[in-house]
Amino acid sequence: MKILFAYKVNWGVFTMYDSIKEIVKDSMDSGKPISELIIEQECNLSGLPRHEVWDKMKRNLQTMRAAVKKGSEGEGVFSKTGLTGGEAVKIKEYRKKHRSLSGDSMMEAIQDAIATNEVNASMGIVCATPTAGSAGTLPGIIFMLENRLKLDEEQMVRFLFTAGGLGMVIANHAGIAGATGGCQAEVGSASAMGAAAAVEVAGGTAEQSSQALAMAIANLLGLVCDPIAGLVEVPCVKRNAIGAGNALLSADMALAGCVSVIPADECIEALDKVGHGLPETLRETGLGGLAGTPTGQAIRAKIFGDNA
């Protein structure tokens, strides 16, 4: 039996969105962007006035910015194990000296995504979006878009409301934990959230946000959670870069008019079913995938001892 964090109910004036389809319809009928619908929902859910709800989300944005800054300064940050760290700075220097194959905007997104998760791996402060293991995906997207689209703070906070509101639907119907659904549930969900939010700040419609979300999920469907030594470091840090890149590609395809053959809500349902179909070795146990390779097992033994 699946227990939802929240579900379709009516408590006086309060209604919790239960599907992407419902959000898109309300946006089209009301003329309001998804972000506005989610702000209204959050005010009703929390009982807080709008300015307090807004300020709380703004603090999330500030936390993200601080993590990106910390991970990109000096020589970077390093985890206690030494498995990860310093690679955001390497990308930063690469961007200065070379013409990247994927373009500077993409590399900026990758840098910020990796910087954030290197901070997480070094026991720093990040904003879980939707989890700490996938905390770099949204910062990777939003700060690149800030520079590329000249976003102001209001647009960036709205980006986070859109991402969070759609992420709630994913969480309620498929889950967001690697232990239950694999990395597709963490980085995959973050990528979908970011893709949809990117469409909105770029001037797209709610329907296009829905299409971007669906394509982002489909592109990462089946991604396993196989952290070496059970630590949120390898391959987790770099997978956030993939999540950011996938989100931007999915957003661009949606803005170009491309559509997902499978609707967003059905993609979320597939995400749930695939997650439950993954063996436990590929759901955050550190036993299968890359963690189960000879090198992965050797690293585990070195960190925790041969009998770990």
Task: List the model feature ranges, each with a label.
Residues 103-120, 155-174, 219-227, 262:
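Acidic-glycine-rich active-site phosphate/pyrophosphate-binding loop
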Residues 101, 128-135, 147, 152, ...:
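Glycine- and small hydrophobic-enriched segments that form the cores of compact globular domains
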Residues 2-124, 147-148, 257, 264-308:
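Generic N-terminal targeting/processing segments that precede catalytic cores or assembly contacts
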